[in-house]
Amino acid sequence: MYVLFSYRLSREMKNKTPLVYLQQYAVAAFIALFIFAYGKPVQSQIISTPGYEVLAAPDLWYNDVDGVRVGVRLRGQQPGTFLDGPNRVDFGLWLGTNLPTHPVSYYLRYVEPIPGITDFGSEGSFNLFTSIREGLHNHGVGIEKRWQPGFNEFVYSEASAYLSTHYRFDDEYTHFPLLWQDEVVVRALGRFERQNDNALGFFNLNTSLTVGLPMDTDFFSQFQASYQQEIVIAQNFTLNGRLFAVTATDYLPTEYYHQTAMAPALDWTVSGFTRSRGTIPNAWMDNGNVHVAGGANLRGYTAQNIEAALEGEPMLYSNIGAVNLELRYPNPLDNVLRDIPILGDFLRLNSYLFYDMGAPFDYEEGFDQTLSDAGAGFMLSLNIPDYVGRQRGFNFRYDIPFWLSDPATDEDAFEFRSLFSIGAVIAL
């Protein structure tokens, strides 16, 4: 029922009725009354009752459409549970100071552990999320389950199943509007991830299946899988490999299609850095200086992907496979970071050589032209595990893909190229 209501809400926005405006301002009125009722300022202070507490903090962000986005984030939990108890709420409300067409945006996530499938470190939970922000409706409901033996957060299995709907109602926020279609998408999504160690080192298997329900869009399905393997060669020398493949049926919405270099457009909405244009300077994006990690991740072809999108002919593929390799070697600066009290437990600076190879494919015609690249890079990562040990943080990369098998017509195969990358596909 919740997803059907969200679907109807998305339809109302598409038809430009006042319903969505009423909903947004109702949320704003609710939070104003909430703050007034407790009579306390929202400045990283704790609002608490005997049975429940709310942690409040101001929040600022920027994009070209909203300008400076001013808001508040609230986190609700039972006192003393440290985000592993019942009735957990994460809520944000923002106002764009440019006062665009849709100035108020919000995000809400509610998590309730399911006692029958929950144990220490192995939570099973009911999840509900809803948001209208930066030109996108996104609403869903689902179940998540994690299995973690003991206290080692690097050994685990996770499974989830969601029913959700999303709809892009304002293209002004997007970097590349051609990478989105304008229909409401209702989908069922299942995911499974397993991480453990074997004789070579740690490995990670990640699979997902998306099934689009035939409502505004036609029926479609997409299956995606990746396998990462760490191979310890010697002390401080490791070879990390990744196999990736995605395949889909006809009628795939545009935002699900993959490019050779970067994550599909839908995945850009996960990070605040890439959700809207202007957070990262537009000139950097348009010049191909910023790479959004994901998909086949042939990072050396970022500039070609972006140039094609800007020219109105994006390189989009429903089926593509890839191999990514990174050889990590000692970095003296990483040793300096490790010696910093407290921060040294979470901050890392890795150096590596990389090689990527991939190709789109067709079940009748086989693989298309194979592309590859090679180079060197550095990754700064900050990871603070959450309450169940899941990785939480960010990865910033500086990559130098100095060789391409198929350079642009005005480039040489060997040439200095550099990229700032958001995220990482190899995270072992």
Map each language-model feature to its residues.
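C-terminal outer-membrane beta-barrel translocator/porin domains of Gram-negative envelope proteins
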Residues: A57-L60, F120, N127-F129, V186-E193, ...
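Outer-membrane beta-barrel translocator domains and adjoining extracellular loop/strand segments
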Residues: T101-Y106, N138-E144, Y156, F169-L178, ...
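Outer-membrane beta-barrel initiation region
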Residues: S44-T118, K145-E153, E172-G201, A293-L298, ...
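Transmembrane beta-strands of outer-membrane beta-barrel pores
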Residues: L60-D66, G76-Q78, L93-L99, E112-I114, ...
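Outer-membrane beta-barrel "beta-signal"
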Residues: G375-F378, F416-L428
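Short loop/turn motifs that connect adjacent beta-strands in outer-membrane beta-barrel proteins
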Residues: I46-E53, G80-N87, P115-G124, P149-E158, ...
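Membrane-embedded beta-strand positions of outer-membrane beta-barrel proteins
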Residues: P58, V72, P86-L93, G121-T130, ...
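Bacterial Sec-dependent N-terminal signal peptides
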Residues: M1-S48, L428
